[in-house]
Amino acid sequence: MTLIMHSSLLLIFFILVYPLLTTLNPNQQDSNMAGMTKTAVSSAFFVSLLPLMIFLNLKTEGIITNWQWMNTQAFDVNISFKFDHYSLIFVPIALYVTWSILEFALWYMHSDPNIDRFFKYLLTFLVAMIILVTANNMFQLFIGWEGVGIMSFLLIGWWHGRADANTAALQAVIYNRVGDIGLIMTMAWLAMNLNSWEIQQIFALSKNFDMTIPLMGLALAATGKSAQFGLHPWLPVAMEGPTPVSALLHSSTMVVAGIFLLIRLHPRMENNQLALTTCLCLGALTSLFTATCALTQNDIKKIVAFSTSSQLGLMMVTIGLNQPQLAFLHICTHAFFKAMLFLCSGSIIHSLNDEQDIRKMGGLFNIMPATSTYFTIGSLALTGTPFLAGFFSKDAIIEALNTSYLNAWALTLTLIATSFTAVYSFRLVYFVIMGTPRFLPLSPINENNPLVINTIKRLAWGSIIAGLIITQNFPPMKTPIMTMSITLKMAALMVTIAGLLVAMELANLTSKQVKITPMISTHHFSNMLGFYPMIIHRLIPKLKLTLGQSAATQLDKTWLETVGPKGLALTQMAMAKITNDITRGMIKTYLTIFLLTLILATIPVLL
């Protein structure tokens, strides 16, 4: 069985890499890289179903080592693949979502002169993501980790003629680099103390070690890659990239790499209370903070981006609850509806002449009925509406949190964030779809394109049934709570309904007139993103510059003027003045010096 899984994975890699290899031909004529890439990904998806079906039937996990990369007397680095439920379920989902997004990009990017290069970047990113997911050692995982990082940088800055896109790409790579420090330090610790990067050997050898330091490094790595509080500002500004990039990298695949890293190494984390509490509190804070920022945003893509960050916080909370399988379930369900929300946003933006302000939309249900329907389904799935995909993971997470007897503050923050999810989702639907049109009547609105409708339809099916299918075939590692009061059981649903009521009120508060600054003072915190970018990107550099300038001024004035040249000059001038008096023809001075010299000369003779 392992052989079939391994052969399937190699076939997937070959299918995906083949379009990349064809671009190496310097004499290629009229290449259809975009179409070939979409076909390759769809073929790879169907191939990936074979090992998944075998796994669901036999429930056998496998590890296979292909090639010894580097061998020393004490340290081995091998190419090793791991076929467990995490990799075998995530790879088909990643391929399915990517297939839909690439097909959408054929329509969205059709006028771009470099569309072939764009598809090449997306395909390279997908290969790096599959390497990361299937890796059985830290070195291989690191290759995939850095691969998705550099492709993120290239794709966010795709429209490099715009200063905002370049700034966003740099911001993303710098914040991720801070997180990468944590992963590199952890790998260095493992290499020095355990002499191995193989995941199974790490689990076996680390039982007698205090793993707090490497686990904190992993938490830092996940904070950077998965946009947790502190290293989160890069995710909303990454929306400067094309919408297919936002849908693929910044919703469904790359941003969950940090959470996936913690899931993969969770057996070493489950007994370390400091690491678990850190993840729990960090996730709860991220979830609430980013949900608060989304409440009064008016850019459609930024609202969806903040919701991604909020859901990543919820996944981090689940890691802190010692429930990695629930975090993985939320990763899988979240991929479908979040990618669909981005594609619907892209379709709306494209149809309204690149307009992203939700105050200039409205009434789209009559003009774009299919897109509006799917957009509403995605928003309902995001809020955890019963029996859509998001419900199966979100409800289970809230129940696990309610019955965990852990940090009550984390529980409170997460419940408030869940309520806020409903607020910004329904506010988005209200402004974009309902009401009367508030855009120019000349917009060329046409959604009757199979490249648009079919892709969003595929993801809509996933948003409806993925949760049910995965939960039926993916048994939980721990027995769920069987006895629970009706209040706790209905907690997630109640806060969602409360959020709906608040959303209606917030929609009335938000002025539909486009104003540069908000008129309502309560909106300032949310509109200014909690003042975090202002403090980190403006205040701290300003303080550093001011401090540096004052230090330079003091150094310049004190050492280079007062003590240095000027001080020396004043000393020399005093001495020069004394000697200068000697040469002015003053008889008294001459006689005094003569007598003084005579006395000094006769003293030794007299003695």
From Swiss-Prot:
Leading EC class: translocase
InterPro entries attached to this UniProt entry: NADH_DH_su5_C (IPR010934), NADHpl_OxRdtase_5_subgr (IPR018393), ND/Mrp_TM (IPR001750), NU5C-like (IPR003945), Proton_antipo_N (IPR001516)
Gene Ontology MF terms: NADH dehydrogenase (ubiquinone) activity
Keyword hit for Translocase: yes
Reactions catalysed: a ubiquinone + NADH + 5 H(+)(in) = a ubiquinol + NAD(+) + 4 H(+)(out)
Key word Protein biosynthesis present: no
Membrane topology summary: Multi-pass membrane protein
Keywords attached to this entry: Electron transport, Membrane, Mitochondrion, Mitochondrion inner membrane, NAD, Respiratory chain, Translocase, Transmembrane, Transmembrane helix, Transport, Ubiquinone
Coiled-coil spans in chain: none
EC number(s) on file: 7.1.1.2
Residues annotated as transmembrane: 1-21, 44-64, 88-108, 118-138, 139-159, 172-192, 213-235, 243-263, 274-294, 303-323, 326-346, 372-392, 415-435, 450-470, 484-504, 587-607
Any one biological process term the GO annotation gives: ATP synthesis coupled electron transport
Localization per record: Mitochondrion inner membrane
Principal location listed in the UniProt entry: mitochondrion
GO CC list: mitochondrial inner membrane
Function: Core subunit of the mitochondrial membrane respiratory chain NADH dehydrogenase (Complex I) that is believed to belong to the minimal assembly required for catalysis. Complex I functions in the transfer of electrons from NADH to the respiratory chain. The immediate electron acceptor for the enzyme is believed to be ubiquinone.
Entry similarity comment: Belongs to the complex I subunit 5 family.
The protein's name in its UniProt record: NADH-ubiquinone oxidoreductase chain 5
Taxonomic source organism: Cyprinus carpio
